[in-house]
């Protein structure tokens, strides 16, 4: 990474124009094959690639030339066998160049990200805990109980190919690199139309294409979220100036810039008083939550501005039905594997004044999280642990494994789910999921030994697997040690948010 910094610092005014020459450097392909960029790749590689080929300037230029030649040849050749050979060669060329191209596209953003992380480490101790998915829920627990409305927002799709290229044009002005990116997108398999998350998700996150398309998707989402920053700043400036100034809207942005500059000198302390602290935004993958203490009319204005920004900025229909506004007091929203809501509890207080006494019901708001059983059962049924009704079935594909491996696989899934859903205020749904997995494990073992579940339990006892599935062993896939002390006892209904969970269990993710 230090070498890349020196490379870009040679001419700071033109640092974004030097990406394409890196495509002809051999060490770029070593980085691509080893999936190493000073630890900046956050997703796990599906395969352990071995770098055993040399890529020089001549070889890469020859591959790029052959890619274009094969593209022209495929339109002229009619023979089916030759067409098949042409497609196979094209895929090889694309995949080879694509691996190096993915690394190159990440370099400018990686340098910026690394510098920002170093700055935050100096300000925020233990910043690694902020990577935990569970770190979101204490924030929701603390803030949502004071808010009134919530908007469920789904990031707009489908994404046209040209939009992905246009998003990067604001960051990378290297024309040859953008042309090569456009060529990749239009030539790869079924990428000549639209990207839809249902049909193309397996291709979008396939082993070979995962790196580049995750980068493109994150860039697109970042561009979508820039609307929130723009609208938030606009709302802030409007609150910091008198309403009468903006009755006439001609040269609106010029007025904002002029007035803010003038008033900031004299009213710098007063500006902070107008900042609205009651609008919060949280996103995970393609779904986000926008919560506010304002009225329903205010939330409708935010929705209107967001839709118009997306529609004008990306030049596509922004699908208004993908933003739902609801009142927190009577609506639950599904987010990150939890069904969350704000519950109002009434506590009766006796008050006495002189000789008179009376009862008062005091309402208190509490953030409530439960495990949604229907989506989880759907995920278990899709993974062949039960049927659509939740009735446990055996797992035939695991019947050839040893007994220890079968129990270990079921136990790992159980501990993962228990660990992630430890923040649930009601555990009944989680107990049902554990029961399904426990009985599915027993049916799998009985199938392997050509026995019945009843005979299996009778021989090993009714407490078979009970102790194993309630074991509080740490999940092996986690990185950071748990912050909970071993002596801490969990009380009924107590919520625990861990700061060591960096990914959602696949069963939760698919629900």
Swiss-Prot record:
InterPro entries: Domain_X, Maturase_MatK, Maturase_MatK_N. GO terms for molecular function: RNA binding. This is Maturase K. Signal peptide: none annotated. Usually encoded in the trnK tRNA gene intron. Probably assists in splicing its own and other chloroplast group II introns. The lineage of its organism: Eukaryota, Viridiplantae, Streptophyta, Embryophyta, Tracheophyta. Belongs to the intron maturase 2 family. MatK subfamily. It is found in: Plastid, Chloroplast. One of its GO terms (cellular component) is chloroplast. HAMAP family: MatK. The keyword NAD does not apply. Keywords: Chloroplast, mRNA processing, Plastid, RNA-binding, tRNA processing. PANTHER family: MATURASE K (PTHR34811:SF1). Transmembrane segments: none annotated. GO terms for biological process: mRNA processing; RNA splicing; tRNA processing. It comes from the Eukaryota.
């Amino acid at each position: 990474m230090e070498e890349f910094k020196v490379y870009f610092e040679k001419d700071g005014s033109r640092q974004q124009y030097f990406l394409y020459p890196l495509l002809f450097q051999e060490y770029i392909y070593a980085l691509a094959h080893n999936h190493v960029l000073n630890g900046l790749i956050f997703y796990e590689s599906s395969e352990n690639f071995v770098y055993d080929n040399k890529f020089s300037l001549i070889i890469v230029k020859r591959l790029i030339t052959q890619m274009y030649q094969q593209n022209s040849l495929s339109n002229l050749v009619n023979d089916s066998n030759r067409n098949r050979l042409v497609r196979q060669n094209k895929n090889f060329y694309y995949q080879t160049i694509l691996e190096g191209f993915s690394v190159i596209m990440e370099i400018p953003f990686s340098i910026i990200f690394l510098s920002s992380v170093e700055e935050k480490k100096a300000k925020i101790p233990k910043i690694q805990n902020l990577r935990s998915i569970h770190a979101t829920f204490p924030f929701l627990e603390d803030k949502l109980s004071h808010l009134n409305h919530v908007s469920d927002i789904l990031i707009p799709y489908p994404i046209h190919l040209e939009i992905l290229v246009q998003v990067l044009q604001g960051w990378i002005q290297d024309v040859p690199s953008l042309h090569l990116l456009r060529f990749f997108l239009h030539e790869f398999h079924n990428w000549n139309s639209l990207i839809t998350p249902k049909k193309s998700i397996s291709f979008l996150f396939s082993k070979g294409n995962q790196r580049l398309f995750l980068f493109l998707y994150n860039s697109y989402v970042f561009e979508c979220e820039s609307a929130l920053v723009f609208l938030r700043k606009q709302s802030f400036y409007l609150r910091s100036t008198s309403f009468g100034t903006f009755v006439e809207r001609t040269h609106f942005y010029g007025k904002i810039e002029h007035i803010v500059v003038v008033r900031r000198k004299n009213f710098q302390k007063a500006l902070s008083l107008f900042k609205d602290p009651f609008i919060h935004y949280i996103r995970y993958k393609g779904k986000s939550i926008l919560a506010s203490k304002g009225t329903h009319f205010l939330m409708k204005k935010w929705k209107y501005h967001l839709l118009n920004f997306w529609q004008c900025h990306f030049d596509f229909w922004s699908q208004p039905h993908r933003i739902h506004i609801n009142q927190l007091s009577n609506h639950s929203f599904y987010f990150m594997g939890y069904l969350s809501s704000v519950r109002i509890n009434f506590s009766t207080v006796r008050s006495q004044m002189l000789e008179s006494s009376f009862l008062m019901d005091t309402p208190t708001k509490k953030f409530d999280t439960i495990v949604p059983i229907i989506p989880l059962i759907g995920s278990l049924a899709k993974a062949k642990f039960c049927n659509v009704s939740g009735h446990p079935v055996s797992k035939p594909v695991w019947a050839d494994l040893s007994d220890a491996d079968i129990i270990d696989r079921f136990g790992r899934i159980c501990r993962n789910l228990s660990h992630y859903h430890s923040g649930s205020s009601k555990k009944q749904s989680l107990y049902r999921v554990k029961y399904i997995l426990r009985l599915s494990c027993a049916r799998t073992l009985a199938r392997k030994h050509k026995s019945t579940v009843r005979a299996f339990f009778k021989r090993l006892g009714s407490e078979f697997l009970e102790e194993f599935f309630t074991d509080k062993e740490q999940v092996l896939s986690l990185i950071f040690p748990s912050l909970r002390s071993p002596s801490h006892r969990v009380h009924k209904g107590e919520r625990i948010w861990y700061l060591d969970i960096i990914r959602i269990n696949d069963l939760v993710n698919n629900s």
